[in-house]
Amino acid sequence: MQDKIMKFLAYDGKISVVCTSTTELVEEARKIHDLSPVATAAFGRLLTISAIMGNEMKSAKDKLTVQMKGNGPLGTMLVTADNFPRVKGYVANPVVDLPLNDMGKLDVGGAIGNAGFINVIKDIGLKEPYVGICPLISGEIAEDFAEYFAKSEQKNTAVALGVLVDKDGVKSAGGYIITPMPDATDEEISKIEQSIFKAGAISKMLDKNMTLLEIAKSVTGDENVKLIEENITPEYECDCSKEHMEDGLATLDKDVLKEMIEEDGKAELVCHFCNKKYEFSKEELEDILEKNKNN
């Protein structure tokens, strides 16, 4: 299935459902960062929820930054997204390897840790960006974001995220968020809770080649869900360039630039988000230093 985000309404418009498949996106990230299986599962979940949240923003100029920092060996994960959504990110320790957890699954919670925080920054063109911080609950990511939505955005939201990894890479990845509107009844919410439990893991549903419409019906228990938006394709895309890297070098102290020129005679910069390398010759560094002197 092609990566896609689809939006639905269930129970006559009283329940909002957003479903996404992100298998290709997560596999691309795995290759770029050479991620271990557990790092793939963790980073894939964060990329998926960030793609959903990024797409919820209104303007093409809006930007989302999501940082997740726990006390586990994975360290900090950071993802940025726009409303397209184009996402990119990095993992502090991409090669972390842990034994399977008690359920025989990749130990995402152990890799991230259960002490730490989620930091969400939304730059939506106001004077100051919106910042929401929420402590981690389990490190499993979906539970942590359900807590974030409840505490920071005052939305009771069911969140499911999953990445299925085998020896060849990512078999399936995706997620969904379900948000009741104020007029949703307790009976409808209860039916959804039961349906979510019965439906099982999102990664398993995608691996069975279920469509996003079928998944939306399955997790809500409503056969009459209404599709309201489709043809949204999340992508892993980095906008780095040599010009951006040069801007970064230009912010360095003059003495640091002089040291690079005198000791190394060149510089190599690597983009955190896509691992692309940029080479700067001695002459280019001298030009940057000269511009610095004139500023």
Residue map of PLM features:
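Interaction interfaces in information-processing and related assembly proteins
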Residues: 1-229
